[in-house]
Amino acid sequence: MRTDFETLRELVSGFSAGSATRPGEPTSDGLAGSRPRPPLDCQAPDVLVPGPQEAYPYDLHQTFERRSSSTSYGTEPLEAEPLLGMVRDALADDARTWGEDAEACPLEPFVLLLRPSGAEPGIYRVRLDGVDLVRPLPEAEVIEGMTVQKEFARAGAIVSVAANLDEADTWGGAAGYRFTMSRSAALIYSLHLRAVARGLVGTVFAGFATSAVRHLLDSDGVSRHQMFAVTIAS
């Protein structure tokens, strides 16, 4: 296997090349604090504050015992508030577990509500203290192009967790990336098991195609990179 660092540098440089409104800036120099990421432009901030979750019907052991495989997703709508509450709780677990280190490299979950009840379909961002509507859903073909497999776009929702790799690099260099990737995977698997414990199904996958969400989720691959994802359905 060949390790071509020059090609990697060109890719990273391209991701951070800027746009018509924001000039490009260097990355991986340990100075993330001097170039804070611009705020995400949300269509409707604070559209929902999920309430406390009801008790799960199954504990972790029972959840593992009950798991089974399926080749298709159910077509019933997903209740939006419980789903968004599960995402928030998984994010809160990450914050409690890692404390100051989580604050240095915060995670940012996005939820594509494809077939919800109790909320409008759209792209949402989940925070510890609320939920923002980022924008409406794109066309179905666009969603299919974002995912690894087209059938993922037929789920009730897709949850992706993003991170600022520039901040992770400043925090710990290469270890910062591994730390952030591990936490992203833990959050997604935590959400997956919460969903399964409520009788839902889903598929964990490696995340959205970066080029497909560059504008849709304001993800340049450096200051915001979609790390890991999961589908959720009835």
Feature names for model-found ranges:
Residues 172-176:
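Short, surface-exposed loop/helix-turn segments at secondary-structure junctions
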